[in-house]
């Protein structure tokens, strides 16, 4: 049982980034060494269960959580980024958003040898970015073993678009 109440470090900001959105801000949590340590401790339990070879973090807050998690678990870290941010050859995927489209990329040689991959991000909302990352990991040669998020917005149904046979873990859930 944890003595750190992670939910108390999440600030709710109405109408950001646009009217009608209730934004869950992790920045107060990031300012607390105790809260960050607890997040990494809890996510490391997901690593123990899923046994990945690498952590893949989604730009940009997935880097903030994913890199220290990889370090804690003795694993490598691979960033998934927006287009044009990674040097060298990349593998990319285009995906649809609620109002438009976007693209994610990973270095072409990042997942050589079919490593087992845990995808990490700060937030699961509609699941579009996580689902695209799952496809990208597979396309780049990785074996996806699961997803881990700090926060899940359950009312947006993100789990429903992720592969059903994989572990999906979140530390905090909001309706």
UniProtKB/Swiss-Prot annotation:
InterPro entries: Ade_phspho_trans, PRibTrfase_dom, PRTase-like, UPRTase/APRTase
Gene Ontology BP, a term: purine ribonucleoside salvage
Record's catalysed reaction(s): AMP + diphosphate = 5-phospho-alpha-D-ribose 1-diphosphate + adenine
A cellular component term, taken from the record's GO annotations: cytoplasm
Top-level enzyme category: transferase
Signal peptide: none
Keyword Transit peptide: no
GO MF annotation: an example: AMP binding
Sorted UniProt keywords: Cytoplasm, Glycosyltransferase, Purine salvage, Transferase
Pfam families: Pribosyltran
EC number assigned by the record: 2.4.2.7
Family classification: Belongs to the purine/pyrimidine phosphoribosyltransferase family.
Function: Catalyzes a salvage reaction resulting in the formation of AMP, that is energically less costly than de novo synthesis.
HAMAP family, sorted: Aden_phosphoribosyltr
Identification of the protein by name: Adenine phosphoribosyltransferase
Gene name in the database record: apt
